[in-house]
C-alpha cells in the first residue's frame, strides 16, 4: 500500500476560506510561474491533455487540482506558485540548480537545454512583489471571519505583512538548509516526498478536518529545515492502493514510476507542467524528484552519506546519496536501479571535468564504504561519471596516448652473465660481452693474484666492473667461464668440417656415426677454481719495526693478527662448496679443531712463496727472520713453522694442490663421538680428496709419478697434526700463564677456552691418510 503524507498539523486553526480569491473550477495552475517569471497558463478542464488525470489507473496520470463543490466557486484564487517554490527551497542547493520535473537533470544527448530565464531565480523577488499586490485583499477585516464552506482543503492561502517581510530578507527560500538531513524516498516508493521532513506533532491521518496549507506553517524558517525526529508516530496515511493519489510521472527519455515502484520508459515527447491536485481525502500530496546539490566552489566533488534510516511502517527506507547506502535495504542511485541497468539515466549531475586528481577533495561520510560508488558504475547509453582521475587507466573518458605502431617489439637483448652489459656472444662457454672475455683471458693466462679491498662482495656491472678485478674474476668463474671451452669448441668445429665431406656416405650407410670426442673438458667451474676465488686476502699486522723487538710485543702482535685471521678463516670456510650444508654445530666444531692447522699451513705457503722457506712471513709488515728467532721462547715455535714451508718448497707444491690440501686440513680432525652430519662430512671430504688427485694429474700429466706424489702430499697432511700439537701446547701454556702477560683477542680466547678441555681429555679423532 502506497504511503501518503500531508502538511496538515493537528491542533492548528484552519485558514478561513473567505480570504481566498475565487477561481474557475477545473483550471490547472502553473506552479512554475514564479520560477519562470512568466504569467500563469490556464488550461481548460476539458482539454484533451488533462484527460488522463481523471483516470485513476492511468500509467501517466498528471497531478491536477480539482475543486470540490461548494468551495468558493465565485472567488478568484491566488497563485500557489510562491508557496510551492518556498516548499521546494529545501532541495535548492544553489541558485543555478533546477528544481522539479525534467528541469532537474542536465541536458542529455538529443535533448535541448532549458533557457536561462527558467533558471534565473532573481525573478523571485519580482514575483513576490506581484503576489504582494495581488494578495492585498488579505488586509480586509472580513478575512478574519470563519469560513462557512466545507471542511475540504482550500485552494489558496493568504500572506501577512510579517511573512512578506521575512521573504524579502530571505528571497531564496530555504536554500540554505542541509540536504543531508532530508529523507529522499522510502523503499516502496521511487519518488521523493518533501512533506515528510516537516516536524509536526501528530499524524494527519488522525485529524483531516484542518487545512494542510497553513501560511504561518509555510513561512516558518525552521519547519522546512528541521530533520525527521524519528518519533513514535510517523507520518502514515491510512488508505488503500485504489485511492486516486499517484506520484508525478516524468515522460520523454526519463524513467517512469510504476505502481510497484519500477521504472519504465515513456514515448511521450510532451513536457508536462508540474501540477497540484486536490485529493478526496481532503489533503494535498506533493511529490517531486530529488535534487542533488551542485557546489560552486570549483572542481570539488563532495560524496555525502548518511547514518540513519527512515522507518516507515514495517519497512526500512535506505537513504543513498552518490551511491552510498546507510542500511541493508534497497539502494537507489537516483537515476538507476540495480534491476534495470539497460535504461538511460535520469540525472547526469556531474559532467566530466578535465582536472587533475590533486584538485579533487572527497568528503567521506559515515555510510557503508563497501557499497559501489556512483562514479564507478557504468550503464549502456550513458556517459560515465568522472571521478576526476587524470590517469587514462582510471578515467574511461580520457583516451590513452596512441602507441607507436612503427616500433616493432623485437626479442630482448642478450645480457652478459658477468656485468649485465649487452652480450656479444658465447665466450669460453658463457654468454658474455667482449670486455669480460678479454679480462678473463688475461686474468687466467697472466696468473694474477687479485685481492679485493672490500669483503669479496663488490657489485659488478657495466659501470663498476673495473673497480674490483678480484670480484670480477670470481664472478667469471661462478658464471662458468673456462679456457678449455674454447679449445673444445674448435675441436668440435673441426670434427664437423671433416664430417661434411662424408655426409652422403653417412646418410647412405646408417652404421656410420659422427666422430665425437670420448671425453670433453668440463665446462662448469671446478671446485679448485672456486677455491681460488674465495681465498682470503693477506692481512697486515700493524707491527712497528722502529721500536726495539721484544718477545712480549711480538707474541701479542701475532695473537692479534691470529684473531683477525681466524675471522677471515670462518668466512672462507662458509664459502667452501658443501661446507654450509653441514649441521651448524658441526661447522663450529670443525673450525675450533682446525684453526691452528689453517693458520700454520697458510703461514708456510706465504713463507715458501716469498722467502723460499728461509723466514716466516706472518704479514707483509711482520717477517720473523733469523735475528728475531733468537729471542726467548721464539726459536722452538719458529722451528716447527719452518718445517711446513721447507716441505712445501721440497715438494714444489702448486697453487691448486695447496688449495685442496688446505681444505682437507679443515676436515682433518673431528670429535671421537663423530659429527651430527657424519655421512655428509665423509662425502665432502672424499670429494676434495679427489680434487687433490685431479690437481696432481693436471700438474704431472698422465705419468706414473701421480700416485707417488699423492702419497707425498698426503704424508705432509698427516705430519701437520704433530706440528699443530706442538703449537697448541705452547699457545695453551701462554694463555694459562698470566705471568707472561701476553694478550689474546676475545674470539681467539673463546676458542682456546673451549678447546683446552677437549685436548686434555683426549676427545679428538685425527683423520690420517697413512698408518704410523
UniProtKB/Swiss-Prot annotation:
UniProt entry keywords in alphabetical sequence: Acetylation, Chromatin regulator, Chromosome, Cytoplasm, Cytoskeleton, DNA-binding, Isopeptide bond, Lipid-binding, Metal-binding, Methylation, Mitochondrion, Nucleus, Phosphoprotein, Receptor, Steroid-binding, Transcription, Transcription regulation, Ubl conjugation, Zinc, Zinc-finger
Phosphoserine: residues bearing it: 47, 115, 136, 143, 203, 211, 226, 307, 400
Protein name, as recorded: Glucocorticoid receptor
Stretches with biased composition (Basic and acidic residues): 1-15, 158-170
Region (Modulating): 1-415
Location in chain, cross-link Glycyl lysine isopeptide (Lys-Gly) (interchain with G-Cter in ubiquitin): 414
One GO cellular component term: cytoplasm
Domain comment in the entry: Composed of three domains: a modulating N-terminal domain, a DNA-binding domain and a C-terminal ligand-binding domain. The ligand-binding domain is required for correct chromosome segregation during mitosis although ligand binding is not required.
Chain positions of all zinc fingers (NR C4-type): 416-436, 452-476
Stretch list, region Hinge: 482-518
Region (Interaction with CLOCK): 480-772
Polar residues composition bias: residue spans: 499-513
Stretches for region Interaction with CRY1: 527-692
Domain NR LBD: residue ranges: 519-753
PTM notes: Acetylation by CLOCK reduces its binding to glucocorticoid response elements and its transcriptional activity. Increased proteasome-mediated degradation in response to glucocorticoids.
Crosslink site: Glycyl lysine isopeptide (Lys-Gly) (interchain with G-Cter in SUMO): 277, 293, 698
SUPFAM superfamilies, A to Z: Glucocorticoid receptor-like (DNA-binding domain), Nuclear receptor ligand-binding domain
Amino acid at each position: 500500500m502506497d504511503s501518503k503524507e500531508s502538511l496538515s498539523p493537528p491542533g492548528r486553526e484552519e485558514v478561513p476560506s473567505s480570504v481566498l480569491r475565487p477561481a474557475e473550477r477545473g483550471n490547472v495552475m502553473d506552479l512554475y510561474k514564479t520560477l519562470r517569471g512568466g504569467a500563469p497558463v490556464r488550461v481548460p478542464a476539458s482539454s484533451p491533455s488533462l484527460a488522463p488525470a481523471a483516470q485513476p489507473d492511468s500509467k501517466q496520470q498528471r497531478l491536477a487540482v480539482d475543486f470540490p463543490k461548494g468551495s468558493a466557486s465565485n472567488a478568484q484564487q491566488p497563485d500557489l506558485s510562491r508557496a510551492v517554490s518556498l516548499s521546494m527551497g529545501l532541495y535548492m542547493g544553489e541558485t543555478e540548480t533546477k528544481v522539479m520535473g525534467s528541469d532537474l537533470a542536465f541536458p542529455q544527448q538529443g535533448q535541448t537545454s532549458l533557457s536561462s530565464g527558467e533558471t534565473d531565480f532573481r525573478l523571485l523577488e519580482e514575483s513576490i512583489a506581484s503576489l504582494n499586490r495581488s494578495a492585498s485583499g488579505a488586509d480586509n477585516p472580513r478575512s478574519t471571519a470563519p469560513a462557512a464552506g466545507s471542511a475540504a482543503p482550500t485552494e489558496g492561502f493568504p500572506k501577512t505583512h510579517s511573512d512578506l517581510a521575512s521573504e524579502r530578507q530571505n528571497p531564496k527560500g530555504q536554500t540554505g538548509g542541509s540536504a543531508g538531513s532530508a529523507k529522499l524516498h522510502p523503499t516502496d516508493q521511487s519518488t521523493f516526498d518533501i512533506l515528510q521532513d516537516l516536524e509536526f506533532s501528530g499524524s494527519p491521518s488522525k485529524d483531516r478536518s484542518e487545512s494542510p496549507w497553513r501560511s504561518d506553517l509555510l513561512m516558518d524558517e525552521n519547519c522546512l529545515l528541521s530533520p525527521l525526529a524519528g518519533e513514535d508516530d510517523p507520518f502514515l496515511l491510512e488508505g488503500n492502493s485504489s485511492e486516486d493519489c499517484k506520484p508525478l510521472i516524468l515522460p520523454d527519455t526519463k524513467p517512469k514510476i510504476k505502481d510497484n515502484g519500477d521504472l519504465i520508459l515513456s514515448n511521450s515527447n510532451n513536457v508536462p507542467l508540474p501540477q497540484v491536485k486536490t485529493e478526496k481525502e481532503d489533503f494535498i500530496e506533493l511529490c517531486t524528484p530529488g535534487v542533488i546539490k551542485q557546489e560552486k566552489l570549483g572542481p570539488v566533488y563532495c560524496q555525502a552519506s548518511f547514518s540513519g534510516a527512515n522507518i516507515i511502517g514495517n519497512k526500512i527506507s535506505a537513504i543513498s546519496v552518490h551511491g552510498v547506502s546507510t542500511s541493508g535495504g534497497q539502494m537507489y542511485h537516483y537515476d538507476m536501479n540495480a534491476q534495470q541497468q539497460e535504461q538511460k539515466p535520469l540525472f547526469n549531475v556531474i559532467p566530466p571535468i578535465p582536472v587533475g586528481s590533486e584538485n579533487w577533495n572527497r568528503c567521506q561520510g559515515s555510510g557503508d564504504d563497501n557499497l559501489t560508488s556512483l562514479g564507478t558504475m557504468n550503464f549502456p547509453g550513458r556517459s560515465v561519471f568522472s571521478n576526476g582521475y587524470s590517469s587514462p587507466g582510471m578515467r574511461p573518458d580520457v583516451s590513452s596516448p596512441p602507441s607507436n605502431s612503427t616500433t616493432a617489439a623485437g626479442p630482448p637483448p642478450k645480457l652478459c652473465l658477468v656485468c649485465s652489459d649487452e652480450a656479444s656472444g658465447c665466450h669460453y662457454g658463457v654468454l658474455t660481452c667482449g670486455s669480460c672475455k678479454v679480462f678473463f683471458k688475461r686474468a687466467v693466462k697472466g696468473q694474477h693474484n687479485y685481492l679485493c679491498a672490500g669483503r669479496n662482495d663488490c657489485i659488478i656491472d657495466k659501470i663498476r666492473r673495473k673497480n674490483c678485478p678480484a670480484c670480477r674474476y670470481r664472478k667469471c668463474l661462478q658464471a662458468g667461464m673456462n679456457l678449455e671451452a674454447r679449445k673444445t669448441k674448435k675441436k668440435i668445429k673441426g670434427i664437423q668440417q671433416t664430417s661434411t665431406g662424408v655426409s652422403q656416405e653417412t646418410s647412405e650407410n646408417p652404421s656410420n656415426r659422427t666422430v665425437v670426442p670420448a671425453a670433453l673438458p668440463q665446462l662448469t667451474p671446478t671446485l679448485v677454481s672456486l677455491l681460488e676465488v674465495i681465498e682470503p686476502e693477506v692481512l697486515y699486522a700493524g707491527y712497528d719495526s722502529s721500536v726495539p723487538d721484544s718477545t712480549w710485543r711480538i707474541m701479542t702482535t701475532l695473537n692479534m693478527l691470529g684473531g683477525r685471521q681466524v675471522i677471515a678463516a670462518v668466512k672462507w670456510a662458509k664459502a667452501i662448496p658443501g661446507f654450509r650444508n653441514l649441521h651448524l654445530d658441526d661447522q663450529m666444531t670443525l673450525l675450533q679443531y682446525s684453526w691452528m692447522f689453517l693458520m700454520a699451513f697458510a703461514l708456510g705457503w706465504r713463507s715458501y712463496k716469498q722467502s723460499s722457506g728461509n723466514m716466516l712471513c706472518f704479514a707483509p709488515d711482520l717477517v720473523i727472520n733469523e735475528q728475531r728467532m733468537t729471542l726467548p721462547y721464539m726459536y722452538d715455535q719458529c722451528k716447527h713453522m719452518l718445517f711446513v714451508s721447507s716441505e712445501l718448497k721440497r715438494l714444489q707444491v702448486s697453487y691448486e694442490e695447496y688449495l685442496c690440501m688446505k681444505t682437507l686440513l679443515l676436515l682433518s680432525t673431528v670429535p671421537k663421538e663423530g659429527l651430527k652430519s657424519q655421512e655428509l662430512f665423509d662425502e665432502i671430504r672424499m670429494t676434495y680428496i679427489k680434487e687433490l688427485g685431479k690437481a696432481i694429474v693436471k700438474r704431472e700429466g698422465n705419468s706414473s709419478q701421480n700416485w707417488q706424489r699423492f702419497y707425498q702430499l698426503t704424508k705432509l697432511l698427516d705430519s701437520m697434526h704433530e706440528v699443530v700439537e706442538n703449537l697448541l701446547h705452547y699457545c695453551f701454556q701462554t694463555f694459562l700463564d698470566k705471568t707472561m702477560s701476553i694478550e689474546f683477542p676475545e674470539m681467539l680466547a673463546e676458542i682456546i677456552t673451549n678447546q683446552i678441555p677437549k685436548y686434555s681429555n683426549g676427545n679428538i679423532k685425527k683423520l690420517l691418510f697413512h698408518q704410523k
